[in-house]
Design a protein with these regions (language model features):
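Ferredoxin-like alpha/beta domains used as RNA- or RNAP-binding modules
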Residues: 1-98, 125-207
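The C-terminal cap of the DNA-recognition helix in HTH/winged-HTH DNA-binding domains
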Residues: 97, 112-113
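Short, well-ordered loop/turn sites that connect or cap secondary structure elements
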Residues: 110-111, 130
Length: 207
């Protein structure tokens, strides 16, 4: 998904660092968030939806399709919980969550360029939904690539300092030596991206 707004303005609109670099660190900004006049309930719901779309870099069509799938799901989870699970279990999001990429945008680029395998098969579709016990691996030929050198050094430091389990999500297991990610469980409510208010988004689409 491509946005045509200037990057800094987009971050100020949502008051979130969407690009993961120091350049867009809003804690160092002297400027106020871009805010419109007091919003109606519909306006609040719309803003929550826009934030979620921009955090996961999805088009309206893609994002709405996750709501439709969640609404039709006959599981024990609520619609908003199922919707978050669909978002969290995207391949590009899992790679980002495992700290194999600094941002979701970077993770999507890595997947699109076939840098990873899923269950030892090369993949290049960021939206693939992973399942419990799936194994994602960095391809061998890229482990020595300069592109990944700094990232791998960061992973090694995480591992040495015992910060690894904290930095990666509880529902995934990362092997920092083999450079693999194993899906251990379906993400629970406490594992979701906490800044998002998916209930408001469900209310928006339910109208």
């Amino acid at each position: 998904m491509r946005y045509t707004w200037p990057k800094k303005k987009l971050c100020r609109r949502e008051w979130v660092n969407l690009f993961g670099t120091e350049k867009y660190d809003l804690t160092k900004s002297n400027r106020a968030p871009l805010r419109s006049r007091k919003s109606s309930e519909y306006g609040v719901q719309l803003r929550k939806k826009q934030l979620a779309k921009r955090m996961f870099w999805l088009s309206e069509k893609q994002f709405a399709s996750y709501f439709t799938k969640a609404q039709k799901s006959k599981a024990e989870w609520t619609t908003w919980e199922k919707m978050m699970q669909f978002l969290e279990l995207r391949l590009d999001n899992v790679i980002y969550r495992a700290n194999f990429a600094r941002t979701r945008i970077q993770s999507r680029q890595f997947v699109s360029h076939a840098h990873f395998t899923l269950n030892w098969v090369k993949v290049d579709v960021p939206s693939i939904s992973v399942k419990v016990w799936d194994v994602i691996s960095l391809r061998d030929k890229l482990k020595e690539s300069p592109l990944y050198k700094s990232l791998l050094e960061e992973l090694e430091e995480f591992s040495k300092s015992n910060k690894w389990k904290v930095s990666a999500c509880k529902w995934i297991e990362v092997d920092s030596k083999k450079l693999t990610i194993t899906i251990k469980a379906i993400p629970a409510k406490e594992d979701f991206e906490q800044i998002l208010d998916i209930q408001k988004i469900v209310e928006f689409y339910s109208k």
